[in-house]
Curated annotation (Swiss-Prot):
Pfam families: ICAM1_3_5_D2, ICAM_N. It comes from Canis lupus familiaris. Homodimer. Interacts with MUC1 and promotes cell aggregation in epithelial cells. Interacts with ARHGEF26/SGEF. Interacts (on T cell side) with CD81, CD247 and CD9 at immunological synapses between antigen-presenting cells and T cells. Keywords: Cell adhesion, Disulfide bond, Glycoprotein, Immunoglobulin domain, Membrane, Phosphoprotein, Repeat, Signal, Transmembrane, Transmembrane helix, Ubl conjugation. GO terms for cellular component: plasma membrane. GO terms for biological process: cell adhesion; cell-cell adhesion. Residues 1-24 form the signal peptide. The gene is ICAM1. The chain crosses the membrane at residues 477-499. It is found in: Membrane. This is Intercellular adhesion molecule 1.
Length: 528
């Protein structure tokens, strides 16, 4: 306001503090008022002077006299924009004054929570700033920080615009929580209410990414042309489902599948090793969460190692044919060939043999060895030799003499050797009866005889004589029964005869004794 209008106001204030003679006083109603910015208010200025006096309202605001009486005037103030101190004055002998405090309130024009970081590490403090433009009276204006509906902290709004900061210790529970600012204009003590304005909420994302790097599980060496698998794992990641995992070989990213479980993740890639990858390559895994990442890498060596080339000059030969066995491998690979002395490690090995029947189905093997990144690798190749030879029948495989007991189960074992396998038949001399070979059956006396066993194949035939003896017993059961009966009857007859004879002897002796006794009784006594 200009300096000149303020001087009378000061003088009026002093006059009010020092009442004039006569005791007349100036009063105002209301003594204080609070209105919404841009609003209007009516002020009644009156005086206790009972004489005609001059009185009025000292203000720079737009005022209108509404009505008046002998010692009072009602003014209306309009479009009030800011706090003001008004003075009613009257001049009755002396000038007296009465002040009025006019408070303007208005709501903040802007309440905003400053942008939050896209990701915030758990365990670190985060400073949030609430920006408030406008709003009065500031002594009754408070800024509140909210998490959802929960009040975290409040501070007074200071400055224009006001920037109020809050420090929050961020935890896992704050992940995806909504934060906002609210202003509280508390005018309840002035007969009004509590006026609140809120900002738009902002969502916070928190994360945990351990300092330890991810773990790579991969074979250290891989053969080109084969499928290989690589795993990348990391524990203690929160929220694990938001983490990005990159697997790459050299500069080429690998297609991977990521599985999440609680605070752990597992990325798996199945890759085919290409020939152009041969050599040592860097395999790396990178886990990114928020604005941080962790990376680990391993060396993988890709190698080419074809199996050794094992050849036979002829895989199938006639007996006593010379066969060349040869094994060969690429440069840098050493081979060892069965049939050669051990300890000869060369890239190419061969030898010759004069094939015999004992070499039929003989297996030859070649072993190739290659060292890759400190690992000794080995591959084997085998070939089988087939030797063609005529039939063989010898004592070991076809015994020339067999003795069997009639009724027992026996098997005639007679095996012929040869390549191709010969057909074997045994016919008995005389009647050309066929002898079963290799079957378990009861022995009969009819199979006894001399047989000619003949083995035949496209490469020849051979014959061997086989004698079969059968031990058997005649059927003397009836004779045995008769003899046994006669022996029994004879024994019984002899026993009966001896018994009767003994009985007659005893009877005879008894009779003689009785006669002797009788004669002794009948003889007269001799006179003395």
């Amino acid at each position: 306001a200009p300096a000149l209008p303020r001087l009378p106001a000061l003088l009026a204030l002093l006059g009010a503090l020092l009442p004039g003679l006569g005791g007349a006083q100036t009063s105002v109603d209301p003594a204080e008022a609070i209105i919404l910015r841009g609003g209007s208010v009516q002020v009644n200025c009156s005086t206790s002077c009972n004489q005609t006096s001059i009185f009025g309202l000292e203000t720079l605001l737009t005022k209108t006299e509404v009505t008046s009486g002998d010692n009072w005037v009602l003014f209306e103030l309009t479009d009030v924009q800011e706090d003001s101190k008004l003075i009613c004055f009257s001049n009755c002998h002396d000038e007296t004054m009465a002040p009025i405090d006019l408070t303007v309130y208005w709501f903040p024009e802007r309440v905003e929570l400053a942008p939050l970081p896209r990701w915030q590490p758990v365990g670190e403090n985060l400073t949030m700033t609430c920006q408030v433009a406008g709003g009065a009276p500031r002594t009754n204006l408070t800024v509140v920080l909210l998490r959802g509906e929960e009040e975290l902290s409040r501070q007074p709004a200071v400055g224009e615009p006001a920037e109020v900061t809050f420090t929050v210790a961020v935890g896992r529970e704050d992940h995806l929580a909504n934060f906002s600012c609210r202003t509280d204009l508390d005018l309840r003590h002035r007969g009004l209410g509590l006026f609140q304005n809120s900002s738009a909420p902002r969502q916070l994302q928190t994360f945990v990414l351990p300092e330890t790097p991810p773990r790579l599980a991969t074979p250290p060496i891989v053969e080109v042309g084969t499928q290989w698998s690589v795993d990348c794992t990391m524990d203690g990641v929160f929220p694990a489902s938001e983490a990005q995992v990159h697997l790459a070989l050299a500069e080429e990213r690998l297609h991977s599948t990521v599985l999440y479980k609680k605070d752990s993740l597992l990325a798996t890639a199945n890759v085919k090793a290409n020939p152009e990858d041969e050599g040592t390559q860097q395999l790396w895994c990178e886990v990114t969460l928020g604005d941080e990442n962790r990376r680990w890498q391993e060396n993988v060596t890709f190698y080419s190692f074809p199996a050794p080339n094992l050849t036979l000059s002829e895989p199938e030969v006639s007996e006593w044919t010379t066969v060349t066995v040869e094994c060969e491998a690429p440069a840098g690979v050493v081979v060892s060939l069965s049939g050669l002395p051990s300890g000869l490690a060369v890239p190419r090995a061969q030898f010759q043999l004069n094939a015999s029947a004992a070499d039929n189905r003989r297996s030859f093997s070649c072993s190739a060895a290659l060292e890759v990144a400190g690992h000794m690798l080995q591959k084997n190749q085998t070939r089988e030799l087939h030797v063609l030879y005529g039939p063989r029948l010898d004592q070991r495989d076809c015994p020339g003499n067999w003795t069997w007991e009639e009724g027992f189960h026996q098997t005639l074992k007679c095996q012929a050797w040869g390549n191709p396998v010969p057909e074997l038949k045994c016919h008995r001399k005389g009647d050309d009866a066929l002898l079963p070979i290799g079957d378990l059956r009861p022995v009969k006396r009819e199979v006894a005889g001399t047989y000619l066993c003949q083995a035949r194949s496209p490469r020849g035939e051979i014959t061997r004589e086989v004698v079969i003896n059968v031990i058997y017993h005649q059927n003397n059961i009836l004779i045995i029964i008769l003899v046994t009966t006669i022996v029994i009857l004879g024994t019984v007859s002899v026993a009966a005869y001896l018994y009767n004879r003994q009985r007659k002897i005893q009877k005879y002796k008894l009779q003689k004794a009785q006669e002797a006794a009788a004669m002794k009784l009948n003889t007269p006594a001799t006179p003395p």
